[in-house]
């Protein structure tokens, strides 16, 4: 194989490929980039860590068609230090790769393309199109509540449901739950013209990488394809794909309480600022001690925030709108901050029942075309 590439263009193009490189594997092939130069004037580059993968297509002058696997880290580092305008990549019959640019020559071992694991089929009949900014904003609201190492596999990801032109995302790690739904234009319908209806669970790591790839530009879209075990995101010139988590997701509607009797409307940014100050105490690392919690006392039209640790204490208060009896309740401070930062509302409404039952955090003003809800379990206070 021998191909010639624009060095700056290829250096920029290969950066997203690194999201699917496995750093801890006994399989050397998935530590590399599969370069396939069997087409005309283009070559494809693929990375796949057996859970998620990325494929890009780049312009190339194909001198000798072929395919090979080159170590991803070494390839990217070599491109970065080369100085010529173009890079020539040659792989001989002994799988020795040679990278030339300007007067510089770098050689490294490669692997035959046949050793690369089978990549899932990247196009299926079931697909739809949605705005990148819409999907990215939804991920912003639910990413903080995803589990990564829960004994229940379905919680180690984000649940999505599409029905009647409405996209819903839900995440839960047993201590907190986040739910977001938007009514948006979803291109593609069923053959009879009806709206699409299906659900799927995307792994936590995949969601994190997808968030980095999506743009805030409202004009940009992402085309999504689904099969029984795989999801594919077509984002511009990139194809990002991942396995799906199999199984029935939790019945989150049953978990979310709607019988609260105590309500408080608070300024979100003001509360976050107060909790950030409390974090100086709750997140102190002291030998032999655990992180402390933050206490919230809803008393009349005041919210009193306090925390005590081995090295100090903090107190703060702010004005709120309060309905119901007074209540003292405690939380993991970081969890509460993450919950509030996931929203972008000026004011949020906190619904409570007791010091031992979960709270709901929602926008103070409801919207017709969107919905968001954050549920958080309190921590038990020492007597």
Where on the chain are the PLM-derived regions?
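Structural preference for solvent-exposed beta-strand-turn elements
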Residues: 1-383
């Amino acid at each position: 194989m021998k191909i010639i590439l624009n060095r700056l263009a290829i250096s920029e193009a290969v950066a997203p490929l690194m999201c699917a490189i496995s750093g801890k594997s006994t399989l050397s092939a998935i530590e590399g980039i599969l370069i396939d130069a069997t087409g005309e004037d283009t070559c494809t580059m693929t990375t796949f860590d057996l859970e998620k993968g990325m494929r890009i297509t780049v312009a190339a002058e194909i001198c000798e068609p072929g395919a090979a696997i080159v170590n991803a880290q070494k390839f990217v580092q070599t491109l970065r230090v080369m100085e010529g305008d173009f890079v020539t990549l040659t792989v001989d019959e002994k799988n020795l790769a040679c990278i030339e640019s300007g007067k510089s020559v770098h050689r490294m071992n490669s692997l035959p393309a046949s050793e690369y694991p089978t990549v899932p089929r990247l196009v299926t009949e079931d697909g739809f199109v949605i705005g990148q900014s819409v999907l990215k904003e939804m991920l912003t609201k639910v990413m903080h509540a995803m589990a990564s190492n829960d004994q229940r596999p379905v919680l180690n990801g984000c649940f999505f449901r599409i029905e009647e032109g409405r996209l819903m995302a839900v995440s839960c790690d047993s201590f907190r739950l986040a739910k977001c739904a938007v009514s948006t234009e979803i291109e593609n319908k069923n053959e009879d013209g009806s709206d699409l209806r299906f659900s799927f669970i995307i792994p936590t790591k995949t969601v994190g990488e997808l968030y980095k790839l999506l743009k805030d530009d409202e004009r940009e879209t992402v085309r999504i394809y689904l099969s029984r075990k795989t999801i594919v995101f077509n984002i511009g010139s990139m194809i990002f794909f991942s396995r799906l988590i199999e199984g029935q997701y939790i019945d989150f509607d049953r978990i979310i309480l709607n019988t609260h009797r105590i309500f408080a409307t608070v300024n979100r940014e003001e509360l976050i600022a107060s909790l950030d100050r409390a974090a100086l105490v709750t997140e102190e690392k002291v030998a032999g001690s655990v992180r402390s919690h933050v206490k919230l006392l809803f008393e009349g039209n005041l919210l009193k925030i306090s925390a005590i640790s081995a090295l100090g204490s903090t107190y703060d208060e702010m004005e709120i709108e309060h309905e119901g009896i007074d209540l003292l309740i405690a939380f993991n401070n970081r969890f509460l901050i993450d919950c509030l930062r996931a929203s972008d509302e000026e004011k949020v409404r906190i619904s409570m029942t007791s010091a031992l039952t979960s709270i709901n955090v929602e926008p103070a003003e409801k919207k017709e075309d969107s919905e968001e809800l954050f549920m958080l379990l309190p921590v038990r206070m020492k007597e």
